[in-house]
UniProtKB/Swiss-Prot annotation:
Keywords: Cytoplasm, Methyltransferase, S-adenosyl-L-methionine, Transferase, tRNA processing. It is an enzyme of class 2 (transferase). This is tRNA (guanine-N(1)-)-methyltransferase. It is found in: Cytoplasm. GO terms for molecular function: tRNA (guanine(37)-N1)-methyltransferase activity. One of its GO terms (biological process) is tRNA N1-guanine methylation. HAMAP family: TrmD. One of its GO terms (cellular component) is cytosol. Specifically methylates guanosine-37 in various tRNAs. Homodimer. S-adenosyl-L-methionine binds at G114, I134, G135, D136, Y137, I138, L139.
Amino acid sequence: MTFNVNVLTIFPEMFPGTLSHSIIGRALNKGLWNLNVIDIRSFAKDKHKTVDDRPYGGGPGMIMKADVIGSAIDEVLSKNKNTKLIYMSPSGIKLNQDISGQLTHFSNITILCGRFEGIDKRILDFYDFHEISIGDYILSGGEVACMVLIETCVRLIPGVVSNTQSIRDESFTLDYKLEYPQYTRPAKWRGLEVPDVLLSGNHKKINLWKANQSYCITKQRRPELTGTIDGDIYE
């Protein structure tokens, strides 16, 4: 099953952007996932291709128009009525690895990228959108957040990352722990040495060290995640 992604944006030239590089770009070229970028502005009816207007009730900035966005969404739905609709929003559920994994089970998703002060709320009321946030901060638009979401999903598609163990060992993938420290050659650098256990060849001890490091780092930096981990085996 190919993972198909539709992106609704007023800046189609931003795509594929970073998604055309490295393993994500190679997967795109191989057809492991498809990208369909739709210019919202092309659905505006006036000669100026207006996509925004002043907010009712006053307030700063401009709001993206429901009629224009709605026409763009209808175009997507006419070709795939079962596409999963997603709106990148700081008010949404915070993205995590589990959400990304769930989204890869859909053959077609559509991501709406807002701009200005946001979109007319009636879009979210009329269509079955799922709002997703990539963090507690504000960006100028949804395009960068959209690329983050796409990359987190595409990496989980079978065949994209050649070493599946890399996926299993990454932060948040296994029991929501942060990843353990990594080292490579040389064994000594500027007075700093690789931990002896990693040079021992004893895989049982190495695995225990990795698990312990992962747990301790998670407990120190993201203590809210340790509630999902059985700490008795690490402490």
